[in-house]
Structures are given as structure tokens and as C-alpha cells.
Amino acid sequence: MSPPMQISCAFPPGPDVVAHAQLAESIGYERVWLYDSPALYGDVWIHLARIAEHTETIGIGPAVLVPNLRHPVAQAAAIATVDALAPGRLAVAIGTGFTARMTMGQRPLTWAETRTYIAQVKGLLAGQEMIVEGKVAKLIPPEGYLPFRPVPIVVAANGPKGLAVAHELGDGVMTIFGSHPEFDWCALLAFGTVLDPGESPESARAYLAAGPALTVVYHGMYEADPAQVDALPGGPEWREELERIPVHLRHLATHEDHLVNVPERDRALLSGEGLTSFTWTGEAAVLRARLDATAAAGTTEILYQPCGPDVARELRAFMDMASAGPRVGTA
């Protein structure tokens, strides 16, 4: 039996993220992951540096870095800088980009581009010369300015091409779809809320705490294939309203308040059935059974992102649920 699943948390980089990280550290979360979507949130590296300086033991990391946002040399320097602030605590996730790209009106990068970028960043962090844009690139800091040491890199992947890159270059994989037991490190992103005993998933509190996670399902399916949302409750009406927005501006509206709030246009999508079907929403016993099943399937780390006006309540409730009795490990 392997060690129990690690319970980590994820946040959009915002004004309260240091306080959230301090609370997460105090109640036993393994790591704080921050998103890298500059059209929506604050700069991921600035906020990670602040967390590094205001916490002592909790792991930290960006999830996920997207190659087009920073030159490989700039990215490697940022990684090394934060690693120096929190030695041994930093891990990095890199992927093709979904929200970060979509909010700029772009599609995700190809896996060929992303593979090259990961290899470049890894080489630069090891002090190697790498070819970037046809020229030799290398970190050449004065002595003592940047550390040269390996930093764990997980690859954010869901399909076969990404999983192949994760096997080749990653220390693990990060996913939003299911478990991958072939990896020693498999991190799964989760959203939702632990309901109080007897609480309805249609309560006002549940809608505030898990609603942003449900509406993201519609956003993602729309970006993959607009017709997909027509099969979801309220999907055709939501799509019709969204598509009244001029196409050159639509990407800005689609992801409004992503994983933070539910904008007016999305509120009709909320339902108790939607929350329990598409998010980690339910009473503690239900979620604990799901957590154990997920661990048994091969997930080694859960990244729980709390939403709503009472993030502290969500963090505590999820950790209480996860900590009640021994957690199942993977075989």
C-alpha cells in the first residue's frame, strides 16, 4: 500500500492568496498551486514569491505555465528565483494552455511546441546551453544569483500526445479527467463544496461555493465544440445569449469571472443536479468515498480549489472530510 493521497489546494492569484496559503499550511494542505492566466488574475510568480516569503513548509507551484507567456530563459529564471526563496518547496506544472490561451482569443498550443519548451526550460535550469529561436541560450547569472538544481516538473495533460510528453519529460502528470496509475505522481484538479449535514446542493451557499466550477464546464465544452453545450441543461439558451456577442469579443465574455464568481449570464445554469454531477459537491461521506475511489484508481494528489465568499470555510471543510480516518492509498 502506497502513502495516502496528498491533499493540495489551488487558487487564482488574487489579493487574499497569501492569507489563504497560510491557512492551508496551518491545517495540513500539501501544496498551494496558483493559476497562470494573466488576462484574468495577478501575476503567478509575484504571488508565489509572496507566498514563499510568508509561509514555512507548504509546497508551492504554478499550475499551469503556458509556453507562449514567457520566453524559456525568463521562465527558467523565474523558476530558479522562487526556488531560491523556498528551497525544496517548488514544483512546476506546464501545459499547452486552455484558459490562459482562450482568454487571449487563441487556441491551445501544440504538443510539439510544448514539448520543445519543457525540454528547453529543463535544460536551462540544469545550467545547459539550449537552442532557443535559433540561438544558443543559457542562464549565466553571477555567482550566488540563481541556484542550478532540478525542480520537479509535472506535465498538464489529458490526451495521448500530452501523456507521452509527460512520460518522456515530466516527473508526473496533472489532469482534469480521471486517474493515470502508470505515473508515480498523478495530480487531479477538483472543484466543489462539502455540504453541511442535510444541506441541499441547491442552497444559496452551495451555489456561491460551487457555482463557478459548474459554469466552467459550459465554458470548456463551448470552446471545444459550441454544439456540445446544447446537450446540457440550459445550454441552448446560454449559447444563444453568448453568441449575440460579436465574435471578436466573445472570448472575453465566455470566461468572465472564471472560477471566481458566476456572472449574470451564467446564473440560469446553476442547479443542484449540475453541482453533484459535474463538481465535487456532496456531504462529507459521499465525497470521502469518491476521494478513496480516486486514490485507488491511481491519483496521488488532489488539487482542491475552493470558491465563493468563504474560502476559509471551504478549505477547512474539505480537509476535515479528507482527514476523517485513514485515506486509501494506491496499490
Briefly describe each language-model feature range.
Residues 1-331:
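Active-site-adjacent structural elements that line small-molecule/cofactor binding pockets in enzymes
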